Amino acid sequence: MNSNSTIGRTTLGESDTISLSFSEPSSSLNSRSTDVVFASTSTLVPQQGSLTSLPPVSSTATPTYYSTSLTYDETLHTSIDVSSTSTLVSSTDSSSSSEQDTYSSQYDPATSSYSIITPSMSIFSSTSPMSSSSSITSEWSSLTSTTPTLSSSATSLSSSWSSLSSPSSLLVSSSLSLSLSSSYSDTKLFSFDSRSSIFSPSTPTVISPSYTYLSSISATSFQISTTSELSSSWFSTISSPSTISNKDTTFPSSSRNTSTSFYSSSLSSTNDFSTISKSSKLSPSASSSTVSISTISVPTSSSVSSSSSKVPSNRPSSSSSSDDTTSAYSSTYTFQSLQSTTSSSIPPTTQTPSTSTISTSPIPTSSQVFNTVAISSSEDSKTIYYFYTQTYDITDSSTTFVTGLPTTIAVAKSEVTSFSAPSSTITADMSFYQHWLDGSLDNNKNQGTSKTNTGTIVGSVVGSVGGILICVLVVWFMLVRKRKAKRHFKENDSFCHEIGRRTGFPTTAQAKEASLQAQDSGSQQRNTETASANNPFSNEFNFKARGNPPPVPPPRNVTAMNGSFQNMRSNFMDQENRFSYGSSFTYSSLGSSTQGGFSTLSSNSIRLGRGLDNDISHDERNTVQNNSQGFLREII
């Protein structure tokens, strides 16, 4: 339906106010958030090395997943406000229902002020013979797209979800241009975005109507696809002794647990804004006018973000689990704005402000950290066994990761009242982890302990036996040496042995022979008597064989005995000087007094024995000396 109407009106001195608003700030707000929670409580029993005989412990795992929650909020807003106040001289209004308006006005000379305000430019102000005020703020458009929040707790094997939304909007509006006429001459230079506009009227200028179309097209597409795959893998070996057959029964079971999650999202938004002015006609009367085109383009903005998350595999000895999570996110946002204005005179050039704000929270990279330690226990009559997961930081030259290894501690009941697992992280190298995977870690410890115990036992036994033998040898050597020294002292250092050694007849051997001969037969006794005739010490210990003491000699005259004393002295010194008591006889008895050799200290003379008295002949004296024991035996 089209209808045209024309109104002609000429009014002098009437004030008219025209106001136009057009708003176009563009803003986009995108927010994405993801919550992924994995809560697992696991109690494991190590099944390797020396720990295979420990009682089994149950294992419980409870995973909880919260999927991505995406929210998009986009708002497009643009405003332009033009206000002009002037005195109308004549006006013609032509209007149609197809949103085409035409105004033609003629104004008397006045003072006009132009003010152009844009969010991205400064304020430019000038004064001319015409009075007009314009500010920019017009029409707004809002587009809000919100995607649903997806929250799921998945324990199934596979799940997927996808959504595609593509909203679009088309906005067509009209703009208004003013036709002014002035009788003054003015020249101005404006610079907007490196473009210039020059207006140099010298005579009144009439501008025909101009037609302006504003179109806005917004297209948005959004797609989310999520794929989750979950499987489980556990490997355990339980050994239980059988009391009937005395054999161990092994129950193996295995499964695999693999969790793979892939999140992808794609957002594509294209906004085209264009303002086109055409059918601009100038009717000057001897004037020059320069028309410039001012184009402001907002460049295309694109934002792509992606993230990937992967949880390393943790493999204990009694159970193995592989938990891999891969997340990818991509977002593309495209915004394009184009405004083209063709005008004559001094156009109110507008620049479309565009603001794009993207707030993205991608799926974070997650890793399992064993902060909560689950402890289980088992006990027998004397010992309590505690099972918990110890956190290890495995480091190498090329990689570093944190894992939990099941650990068992045996504590006596009498030594512990409560137990708490250590929360610290132990740092170990890759060889430790490799030995733990091979199951040789506990075996090496047990072998080293058994070897150490065996060496200690053998060393203690050998040392004890050797020490006892050495002590016995030392004691035996000391006793034998002491006995030999004592025997040697008795035989060689006795008084009789010394006397016999001086006379040339050792008494030790003779005394032994005498003791043996006393126990032998009569023939041996005869041999002993024969030997005793040659050895004066043969009958030394036979006290019965001693003779009677000699008789006491009568007192003698000293003068009569002087001559005989001298003869006896000479004979005695010649024959008997070889005996040990000769010196005693010579110096003590014979030389002690001038009275014939008799001591004046005693009233009786010394008896020398048979054969030594003066009244005995020389032959008898020799015979008696051979049969008697001598003076030394008398003293002993």
UniProtKB/Swiss-Prot annotation:
Biased composition (Polar residues): 1-18, 510-541
Cellular location(s): Vacuole membrane
Membrane topology: Single-pass membrane protein
Family: Belongs to the TDA7 family.
GO cellular component terms given for this protein: fungal-type vacuole; vacuolar membrane
Glycosylation, residue list: 4, 257, 492, 557, 562, 626
Record carries keyword Transmembrane: yes
Residue stretches of biased makeup (Low complexity): 19-33, 87-108
Taxonomic superkingdom: Eukaryota
TM annotation in the entry: 457-477
Name of the protein in question: Topoisomerase I damage affected protein 7
